[in-house]
Amino acid sequence: MTLLNVCGLSHHYAHGGFSGKHQHQAVLNNVSLTLKSGETVALLGRSGCGKSTLARLLVGLESPSQGNISWHGESLAKLNRAQRKAFRRDIQMVFQDSISAVNPRKTVREILREPMRHLLSLKKSEQLARASEMLKAVDLDDSVLDKRPPQLSGGQLQLVCLARALAVEPKLLILDEAVSNLDLVLQAGVIRLLKKLQQQFGTACLFITHDLRLVERFCQRVMVMDNGQIAETQAVGDKLTFSSDAGRVLQNAVLPAFPVRRRTSEKV
């Protein structure tokens, strides 16, 4: 079943010039894509190619200059109030900059409850129980509930943001470079966790990244973005080979391997 359909999406930003005339900077150009229920898709590209702008459009944080985004066959531009609330519940996003994504004055408990208060019909006791449950799902314990963001490590705060997104049981989770600031061990742990949660909840994932290692470990399909366009789409198999220049550049980048768990029988 198709969850999200994007057709002919273009976007630009207007900048004021010295002459007083607005200049338009094109960021996306005629982007089309589909995401199906339960699948994991990567949006791969270098920094500045338009990935994050596309993500903001997909979740409704901005409106496109041209084109259409449909959720379950309904255009986002035509959703009524009730449909828009359901859409905000069904599609959640985890940003790269977790510090800017939370209120530093709020406790973790309050941060986790926030989307549940606005998007779900749960009693306070049920919200608190789910907050604790989501923390355990991301390998954190209740000791962080009364802490505030400045008291957490970067890795812990990113996991809190992931738990917050999962608390409303979304149908689509968008991860915008969400593990890029984590060390390799934490990255590998998050990938294992996402696979487990995806199997448990059947959530579709759009994994926005410039890191091919994450694509090969986590995704079924990959789209390569370059200069605001989708350069190519490939299935992720044993030997992933790109035909576009942008894909080959990323494939040839030298990156360290993911850490692999030793078997208990192996000697150090």
Swiss-Prot record:
Residues 4-252 form the ABC transporter domain. Part of the ABC transporter complex NikABCDE involved in nickel import. Responsible for energy coupling to the transport system. This is Nickel import ATP-binding protein NikE. One of its GO terms (molecular function) is ATP hydrolysis activity. It is a peripheral membrane protein. The complex is composed of two ATP-binding proteins (NikD and NikE), two transmembrane proteins (NikB and NikC) and a solute-binding protein (NikA). InterPro entries: AAA+_ATPase, ABC_transp_ATP-bind, ABC_transporter-like_ATP-bd, ABC_transporter-like_CS, Nickel_NikE, P-loop_NTPase. It comes from Shigella flexneri.
